[in-house]
């Protein structure tokens, strides 16, 4: 990250307008104009899903331990642990009612991370966590996220039996902040919503919506 434009920051105002970005980087000694985090990781995957785009059943687990030493280019040495788990249940065995569970945890194990590279909502692999909040709404040294999703078949044609469906979801996010004395689960932020899905590829199970 580089060329930050912190529009709400005004240290010359009376009183000064200090943002979380500025205060955090000042406290931990990070550059206010750019951030770098370079490292190596150890990864493991377990995947029994019958489809990656729209699974009817199966489980997925992912683990990544990342080490970010200064000698590789990181501003400060640190290490992080990223855990992901997904599970899918076909309630009636006809693919018309699916319940999906998704959870992940992103933890700072050692050292400190630049503000923009802290565990944050919406920065998962597909940028889908913490719907309907904007990306990066929640941020902290450690973060845990959980979501339940119900997928319902609505209409099908002879050409595409899974043409139209709906989805309802509910999620929770919690983050820690050492400098503000906030531990995990002190605050739990909730999100929920409904949506319509239109199937554009029966074979690949690709949906829009």
Question: What is the predicted function of each stretch?
Answer:
Residues 1-93, 171-178:
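Transmembrane beta-strand segments of outer-membrane beta-barrel domains in Gram-negative
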Residues 166-171, 187-191:
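Small/polar glycine-rich anion-binding or flexible loop at a beta-alpha turn
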Residues 76-79, 98-100, 160-165, 180-184, ...:
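Composition- and surface-driven signal marking solvent-exposed, interaction-prone regions
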Residues 1, 42-44, 61-63, 101-103, ...:
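Membrane-embedded beta-strand positions of outer-membrane beta-barrel proteins
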Residues 133-139, 179-186:
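Short, contiguous acidic/charged loop-to-helix segments that flank catalytic cores in large enzymes
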Residues 141, 146, 156-163, 176-180, ...:
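Extended hydrophobic-aromatic, low-complexity segments
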């Amino acid at each position: 990250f580089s060329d930050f434009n912190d529009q709400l920051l005004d240290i010359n105002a009376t009183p000064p307008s200090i943002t979380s970005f500025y205060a955090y980087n000042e406290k931990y000694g990070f550059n206010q104009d750019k951030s770098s985090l370079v490292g190596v990781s150890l990864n493991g995957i377990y995947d029994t899903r019958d489809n990656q785009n729209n699974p009817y059943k199966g489980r997925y687990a992912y683990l990544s331990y990342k080490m970010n030493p200064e000698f590789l280019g990181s501003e400060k040495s640190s290490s992080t642990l990223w855990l992901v788990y997904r599970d899918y249940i076909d309630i009636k065995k006809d693919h018309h009612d699916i319940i999906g569970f998704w959870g992940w945890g992103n933890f700072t194990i050692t050292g400190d991370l630049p503000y923009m590279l802290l565990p944050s909502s919406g920065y998962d692999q597909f940028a889908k966590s913490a719907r309907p909040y904007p990306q990066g709404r929640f941020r902290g040294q450690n973060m845990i996220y959980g979501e339940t999703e119900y997928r319902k078949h609505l209409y099908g044609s002879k050409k595409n039996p899974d043409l139209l469906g709906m989805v309802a979801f509910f999620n929770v996010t919690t983050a820690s902040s050492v400098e503000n004395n906030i531990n995990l689960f002190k605050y739990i932020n909730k999100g929920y919503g409904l949506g319509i899905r239109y199937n554009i590829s029966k074979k690949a199970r690709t949906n829009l919506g």
